[in-house]
Design a protein with these regions (language model features):
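Primarily recognizes the serine-hydrolase "nucleophile elbow" in alpha/beta-hydrolase
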Residues: 367, 372-425
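Alpha/beta-hydrolase-fold catalytic nucleophile elbow
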Residues: 323, 414-415, 478
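C-terminal catalytic histidine-bearing segment of alpha/beta-hydrolase fold enzymes
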Residues: 475-486, 492-591
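Cap/lid segment of the alpha/beta-hydrolase catalytic domain
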Residues: 248-263, 278-369, 375
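Ser/Thr-rich, Pro/Gly/Ala-heavy low-complexity intrinsically disordered linkers and tails
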Residues: 1-19
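Acidic, low-complexity Ser/Thr/Gly/Pro-rich repeat segments typical of extracellular/periplasmic
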Residues: 17-243, 247
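N-terminal cap/lid segment of alpha/beta-hydrolase-fold proteins
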Residues: 222-282
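Serine-hydrolase catalytic core
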Residues: 403-406, 420-423, 428-529
Length: 591
């Protein structure tokens, strides 16, 4: 059963018969008080209540917050602005009130197949972050249609428009009156629904950790058996000692405080091409692995499934790596536990903050510390040349990491995205976790509210919030069209956030993304089409097409990566598929 109305005011009957809605639009002023965000303690949950105390008091909501609306009549999905309508005025709009400008967005109805008798929630998704400190507003116009005709303003909203708020909502009338005036000044007249909220920075949890993070001084490495492993001279694994903020290896204290040290995983790969190489001649690459994976999945498989072994060999690059805590294979049980008990969400996101801290610590250990003096490196490492290469999760959290360090100047972010709460439902990886969540939170509407709230936990590790830091950086996003794990729409959102330019020839030009031609520099975006279908249009897990993985062995991808991460002349984006876009039938020619 849905919880009672929020913000300290239960539903009350107005003398005119108008009542506040059981679920006010989220986010909005109804979910805030004078101190900031004010989520109620009785949010839907399984065993563990949602830890709203970690969120309440924040000055505003996420820059990439999904709005959730419980419309009282069945809506016609054809009347909603979809992904093909981005940038055109539509029945549902998102506005940056401070800038006086629309924000790219789309709207959709929750497509979960078993709604248990509920009407699907109307979801409004930003496709670019709203600037921190600004106010955002969702506007629904008379162009919205129900299944039986034009949609009408909800009675509670019509009452506010008339200046006669429902009983219990008198304190909100002044804010709505001001909102109506702001919208009218922007040329938005007579909406059938409108609500606004403040936007604030959610990155402090990570920034505070990194501000205290020290450079590690201790590590250990032991040789790995590399028999039968191609492109390999030697490998080592072990750990390094890094600062930790996790209490009992679970989550952070409130507020977060450094909690001693812990051992972080360490992997070292030396390619066969370095046999007999001159001293101090090998660039050092930091590798970011994919979701529910490990560095070994990319560096210790004989079939080289992601082409990383061959790539490192052709680059003549030493590769070092650690794990993304929270979303690495050894932590998979944590993610599953969150699925069964959504109130434990910080167990996942705090670990991922720790994972970014560990990766940053590894970079510092290599660049500023003494790691490369270890005999396992055979004196081969060039201590002046560092690069980053991240795949999937490594492309997502790699963007966060690079935004927070200047020790690595050039990075390739392969099949990465942003906007975690929008991205996950569309991923083929989501299916098992959705089963866990639906077993404990049965209401689809309540789940959509929780998914949107979860973005507040994701914010510290969401690259969309670091677009300004990446806007002048030498980074390259490589997108696989129709990606079944990281929806393309979240990659385009990241490109807008960072001002990355799309390098043509390309498959399609996303709205609001500028184009350029090669050769160029970052921040940049390139596209590779495995011809395995288009990006899904609804919030359901993608079928497993392997589009996410397919381009990794293409020469067009490999040569572009090697060129961008070149040890002596890095940061140049080139196109290696001739006059046409790179596709499965035009994957690029070898040098």
């Amino acid at each position: 059963m849905l919880f009672l109305l929020l913000a300290c005011h239960p539903p009350a009957t107005d003398p005119t018969g108008v009542t506040p809605p059981e679920l006010p639009p989220f986010p909005s002023a109804h979910w805030m008080d004078d101190a900031g965000v004010a989520l109620p303690g009785d949010l839907p949950h399984a065993a563990t209540p949602i830890p709203v105390e970690l969120l309440n008091g924040r000055p505003g909501f996420s820059p990439v917050q999904t709005a959730v609306i419980a419309w009282e009549d069945p809506l016609d999905p054809a009347s909603l602005p979809g992904l093909d309508d981005v940038g055109a005025p539509g029945s549902v709009q998102l506005w940056d009130l401070d800038a006086g400008a629309p924000v790219p967005c789309f709207a959709e109805l929750d497509a979960f197949p078993d709604l248990r008798g509920e009407l699907p929630r109307l979801l409004v998704r930003p496709l670019a972050p709203v600037p921190v400190g600004h106010r955002a507003a969702v506007v629904v116009t008379g162009a919205l249609q129900t299944l039986s005709g034009p949609a009408e303003a909800p009675p509670w909203f019509a009452a506010l428009q008339a200046g006669t708020p429902p009983t219990g909502w008198e304190e909100h009338q002044e804010g709505y009156t001001a909102l109506f005036a702001e919208l009218a000044a922007l040329g938005v007249e007579d909406p059938i629904l409108a609500f606004d909220w403040a936007v604030s920075d959610g990155t402090g949890r990570l920034r505070d950790v990194l501000a205290e993070l020290s450079t590690p001084t201790a590590w250990s490495l032991t040789p790995r058996d590399t028999d039968g492993l191609p492109f390999t001279l030697a490998q080592y694994e072990g750990s390094f000692t890094s600062d930790s903020w996790l209490v009992d290896d679970k989550q952070f204290a409130d507020p977060p405080a450094r909690n001693g040290t812990a051992e972080a995983y360490l992997f070292v790969h030396i390619p066969a091409s370095l046999e007999g190489a001159p001293p101090a001649s090998a660039p050092v690459w930091v590798l970011g692995h994919g979701i529910f994976s490990t560095p070994e999945s990319y560096l210790a498989e004989e079939d080289d499934p992601s082409n990383v072994l061959e790539l490192a060999d052709r680059a003549g690059a030493i590769v070092i790596a650690t794990r993304w805590r929270g979303l690495t294979l050894p932590d998979a049980a944590v993610a599953a536990g969150v699925g069964f008990d959504f109130g434990t969400f910080p167990l996942l996101t705090d670990k991922l903050v720790q994972g970014v801290a560990n990766t940053t610590a590894l970079i510092r250990l290599a660049v500023e510390g003494d790691l490369l003096d270890d005999p396992v490196f055979q004196g081969l490492a060039d201590r002046t040349t560092f690069r980053y290469y991240g795949i999937s999760l490594g492309g997502i959290e790699g963007a966060v990491t690079l935004a927070n360090t200047d020790l690595i100047e050039h990075g390739v972010l392969h099949v990465g995205g942003s906007s975690w709460s929008t991205m996950l439902e569309r991923s083929t990886n989501w299916s098992p976790f959705e089963e866990f969540i639906t077993s404990t939170i049965e209401s689809p509407g309540e789940r959509q509210l929780l998914y949107s709230i979860s973005q507040l936990f994701w914010d510290p590790v969401d690259p969309a919030l670091y677009g300004a830091e990446l806007a002048d950086r030498s980074v390259l996003w490589q997108a696989a069209m129709g990606d079944d794990q990281v929806s393309n729409l979240t990659t385009w959102s990241m490109a807008r956030a960072a001002g990355a330019r799309l390098v043509e020839p390309a498959i399609l030009v996303p709205y609001g993304v500028e184009t350029t031609t090669a050769p160029t520099t970052g921040p940049a975006l390139t596209q590779f089409d495995p011809d395995l279908g288009d990006d899904d249009q609804d919030n359901r897990p993608s079928p497993k097409t392997l589009a996410h993985d397919a381009p990794r062995h293409w020469e067009g991808v490999t040569r572009q990566t090697l060129r961008f991460l070149d040890p002596s002349d890095p940061g140049h984006v080139e196109h290696f598929c001739g006059a046409a876009a790179c596709t499965a039938t035009n994957p690029g020619d070898p040098p």
